């Protein structure tokens, strides 16, 4: 199963996926950040990758300054996971991909409530999507 982290304009970052069978092995994750390795999203991904070592995962971050390239690399199997914006992640999961829709969250307080609602464990089933025989799961927002 692939996991999806979704970035919104109101939160700092997000990502899309890694395969469940690769959890104990080395996991390549493409990270979209306009500033590449210098960007805030990439730096947060580095913190996440460091924390993942404590869970037994070896995460290799691959910076991408073009979101389409990150997505295409993910589709081509060059990365088991990808950090991307919610707009692009919508093709994988419409539930999480709708959080930063235009006019959907007119202020940060509403955005925080939407994110909290989306990440509530009662909505776990909505974070998993089956597309063309492949499962994708939103892993973070």
Where are the predicted features?
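Short helix-initiation/N-cap motifs at beta->coil->alpha
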Residues: 60-72
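Extracytoplasmic "Venus flytrap"
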Residues: 26-46
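Contiguous mixed-secondary-structure segments that line small-molecule binding/active-site clefts
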Residues: 85-141
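Alpha-to-beta junction loops
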Residues: 55-57, 75-84
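Bacterial N-terminal signal peptides that target proteins for export
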Residues: 1-9
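Signal peptide-proximal N-terminal region
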Residues: 49-59
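C-terminal segment of classical bacterial N-terminal signal peptides
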Residues: 14-22
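Immediate post-signal peptide segment of exported/extracytoplasmic ligand-binding proteins
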Residues: 21-32, 53-55, 132-134
């Amino acid at each position: 199963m692939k996991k999806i982290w979704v970035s919104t304009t109101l939160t700092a970052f997000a990502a899309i996926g890694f395969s469940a069978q690769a959890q104990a092995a080395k996991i390549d994750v493409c990270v979209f950040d306009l500033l590449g390795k210098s960007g805030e999203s990439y730096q947060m991904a580095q913190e996440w990758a460091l924390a993942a070592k404590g869970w037994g995962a070896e995460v290799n971050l691959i910076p991408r300054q073009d979101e389409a390239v990150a997505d295409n690399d993910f589709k081509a199997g060059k990365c088991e996971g990808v950090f991307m914006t919610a707009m692009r992640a919508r093709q994988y999961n419409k539930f999480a991909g709708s959080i930063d829709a235009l006019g959907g969250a007119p202020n940060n307080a509403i955005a925080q409530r939407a994110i909290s609602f989306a990440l509530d464990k009662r909505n776990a089933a909505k974070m998993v999507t089956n597309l063309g025989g492949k499962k994708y799961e939103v892993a973070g927002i």
